[in-house]
Regions:
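Sec-dependent signal peptide recognition
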Residues: 2-8
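Post-signal-peptide N-terminal segment of Sec-exported extracytoplasmic proteins
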Residues: 27-65, 69
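Short, flexible, mixed-charge glycine/proline-rich loop motifs
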Residues: 20-27
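Thiol/selenol-based redox catalytic cores and closely related redox-interacting motifs
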Residues: 76-147
Length: 147
């Protein structure tokens, strides 16, 4: 019985797809890039990799700096928080807006949303300039699972 359970768990771990986002504790996490405390989840990002601790970021700009020039490896996924709902969204699939009038933790002025409907429902995104993942993260874009 124990052996069957162990085999099932191992198979599930191998075939479960990209790693899911980790829970963010804004009372205890600091940015992996600038080392500032992460106080506002709506601006946060993270990188999760198989067999590694998640890395959190206080601003999408910090996430972009961290990823610049890094090789995209299998089992690594970047996530950003939907600014309106605070749910995690794959960074390579998010809709970005640059809002010059909006103060973000490190001044990138970038916010992310799961889709255009979430962006359109967010008053903070009004008047902002649409951006793509390639605009934010460069031609390699944000890592998806192995991308």
């Amino acid at each position: 019985m124990k052996r069957a359970l162990l085999i099932t768990l191992l198979l599930a771990a191998c075939t479960s797809g990209p790693p899911p986002p980790a829970a963010l504790d804004t009372k205890n996490e600091s940015c992996a890039w600038c080392r500032m405390a992460i106080s506002e989840a709506r601006f946060a990002g993270q990188v999760v990799a198989t067999s590694e601790e998640p890395r959190f970021f206080d601003d999408i700009g910090c996430l972009a700096h961290f990823l610049a020039g890094k090789a995209r490896t299998a089992g690594t996924v970047a996530y950003v928080a939907d600014h309106r709902t605070r749910t995690w969204v794959r960074a390579d699939a998010a809709v970005y807006t640059e809002v010059a009038a909006l103060a973000t933790p490190m001044g990138s002025h970038l916010i992310a949303h799961a889709d255009a409907a979430s962006r359109d429902a967010d008053p903070d995104a009004k008047g902002g300039r649409p951006r793509t993942a390639a605009d934010v993260f460069g031609s390699g874009s944000a890592p998806g699972d192995g991308q």
